[in-house]
Amino acid sequence: MKTKFIFITGGVLSSLGKGLSAASIGALLTSRGMTVTIQKLDPYINIDPGTMNPYQHGEVYVTDDGAEADLDLGHYERFLGTSLSQKNNSTSGAIYYKVISKERRGDYLGATVQVIPHITDEIKSTILSLAKSSIDNNTPDIAIIEIGGTIGDIEGLPFLEAIRQLQTDLGRQNCLYIHLTLVPYLGTAGEHKTKPTQHSVKELRSIGIQPNIILCRCEKPIPDDIKAKISLFCDVEKDAVFSAADINNIYELPLKFYTEGLDQKITSFLNLPTKQANLKPWEQLVNTINNPKGKVTITIVGKYVGLTEAYKSLHEALCHGGIANEITVDLQYVNSEIITEDNVNEIFKGVDGILVPGGFGSRGIEGKIESIRYARQKNIPFFGICLGMQCAVIEFARNVAGIEKANSEEFNPVAADKVIYLMKEWYDFRNNAIEYRDSLCDKGGTMRLGSYPCTLIKNTKAFKAYQTDSIEERHRHRYEFNNIYRDQFAEKGMIFSGTSPDNTLVEIIELLNHPWFIGCQFHPEFKSYPMKPHPLFKDFIHAACNHNKQ
């Protein structure tokens, strides 16, 4: 079957949930037996989000092939249950970079390079490349394209022009436009207001795009008379106006859309096979979430806690661990900068597990180290990820191994004992090459990125969790454990339970005499799915359950 395209745009304001809507539509179509892929196009000028402040962008998601991508790719992977790649995310910066590089090579044969047709053609090429990609050896039946930003943003215009042209290029029967917009409910008036939606659609139509379906983001489901009004003023069929009301948890969204008949409308418009959707796994998932058998409290000690989107995949992975154990996970975020030896008892009173996530820079580091000391001494389940593992190494060095001035080269380049140091080289198995780095390298795209193999030692907590001695996990770091301290740490009770296959890089540490204390250099949250929770998160929450029962 020829690949058909669904384009999703957003209006009125940002953060309405285009990514979740795209992921849920993808899940519905997948449940009907179709092969689906999703792409996010971001209008910002950065090549990728790798160097952006988490407070501005949120989490930077990492794919198997090493792309630093928008957090929406996490939603796509979790809802589709599949791995995506660099092809599934692009930006204005990446598009312009390709066009300018072609111009410098002389590919345009002396033409005046312009937004139309050169930039728009490159955008179309990026979109159409999805139709040529293979998913489990199958060409995708459906490619869902989410356009970042909001209708009316100047930087998004080339993307809108490109998807407008694609309808002519591919045929109307192969393209569907879905517009997600806000329909606010005014309590004082007692009604939903449609004017923002009308103006948003008017703006979209002025560009040349007529939406086929309108998703109405709202606090509560909109009544039929409001749907009829939107249908009239926005020139869409009444049965093509759908509610996207607030829900208790995001995994209910595919079921809500199914109840509304959204997937049926999409398959009808695109003339897709009408195989019945199998949503039993989603129903079982939601039932487990809504009927927990207990609760544990996990404290996340980080530096970006003012915006929980900075830890989106981590949040979801912990919830997946709860699903696997049939319990609710109550997450508490604590700013590491406020943690001291004097208040640590009060901050962690009643918690069942402590997690220190990834991050960069020295701000708040001592608070993280103090949190780890507390977890180690009080036998509270501890999970350190990336920087969290490195902080665990520093804490162990200072307070157990007797290396009082232990530090990371990242925080103190002239430290006497750099137990964490800058990686100068590593083997990239995907490209069969040695990667070289130093402190003068560019910041963007130069870390150890993507999926790398790891060998586990039997009879360790890590091996018990994974039930295998060979795994692959996704990385995003430039600092690593300093091997000259391995023997010294091992003598004091640290176990290096996971390493690179050549044993040169430490990937997982754990403590011998502790109920559950694990640190990993990789990011396991990027490979956790609601239907298949990650082994480490499943085991961490299980350990928290045991602590809760004490």
UniProtKB/Swiss-Prot annotation:
PROSITE patterns: GATASE_TYPE_1. The active site is at 386 (nucleophile), 523, 525. Pathway: Pyrimidine metabolism; CTP biosynthesis via de novo pathway; CTP from UDP: step 2/2. CTP binds at residues 14, 153-155, 193-198, 229. InterPro entries: Class_I_gatase-like, CTP_synthase, CTP_synthase_N, GATASE, GATase1_CTP_Synthase, P-loop_NTPase. Mg(2+) binds at residues 72, 146. GO terms for cellular component: cytosol. It catalyses: UTP + L-glutamine + ATP + H2O = CTP + L-glutamate + ADP + phosphate + 2 H(+); L-glutamine + H2O = L-glutamate + NH4(+); UTP + NH4(+) + ATP = CTP + ADP + phosphate + 2 H(+). Allosterically activated by GTP, when glutamine is the substrate; GTP has no effect on the reaction when ammonia is the substrate. The allosteric effector GTP functions by stabilizing the protein conformation that binds the tetrahedral intermediate(s) formed during glutamine hydrolysis. Inhibited by the product CTP, via allosteric rather than competitive inhibition. It comes from the Bacteria. Residues 1-272 are annotated as: Amidoligase domain. It holds the Pfam family CTP_synth_N. Keywords: ATP-binding, Glutamine amidotransferase, Ligase, Magnesium, Metal-binding, Nucleotide-binding, Pyrimidine biosynthesis. L-glutamine binds at residues 55, 359, 387-390, 410, 478. CTPSs have evolved a hybrid strategy for distinguishing between UTP and CTP. The overlapping regions of the product feedback inhibitory and substrate sites recognize a common feature in both compounds, the triphosphate moiety. To differentiate isosteric substrate and product pyrimidine rings, an additional pocket far from the expected kinase/ligase catalytic site, specifically recognizes the cytosine and ribose portions of the product inhibitor. Belongs to the CTP synthase family. PANTHER family: CTP SYNTHASE, CTP SYNTHASE-RELATED. This is CTP synthase. It comes from Lawsonia intracellularis (strain PHE/MN1-00). The gene is pyrG.
